[in-house]
């Protein structure tokens, strides 16, 4: 399996257990993971520096993932940041809504670890650290 060594990933989720689980899965593959408990904190981090990949929950209080990705796409270089939506909603129309809002891909909760790593590799390896 390919490694995620030195890939900087921002994980955004209001559930601390989900954040910890995602961090563990990604760090186990060698990624450098930053976490944010909400979209506002994530946006603050993203305004300072863009990671190689954003993994964000969709349903969060105050600012949801759809609003977050819309604001990210307005940032300098934000239009090219790979972003994966996380949600408990598994209907096809939910997936389409995530893609229309600006996410590149979509994962349902509970997250399948192999599918998470496959998608993260797909996007991170397409944009290596020096790109």
Curated annotation (Swiss-Prot):
The keyword ATP-binding does not apply. It holds the Pfam family Response_reg. Residues 8-124 form the Response regulatory domain. The modification 4-aspartylphosphate is found at residue 57. Keywords: Phosphoprotein, Transcription, Transcription regulation, Two-component regulatory system. GO terms for biological process: phosphorelay signal transduction system. This is Uncharacterized 14.6 kDa protein in sodA1 3'region.
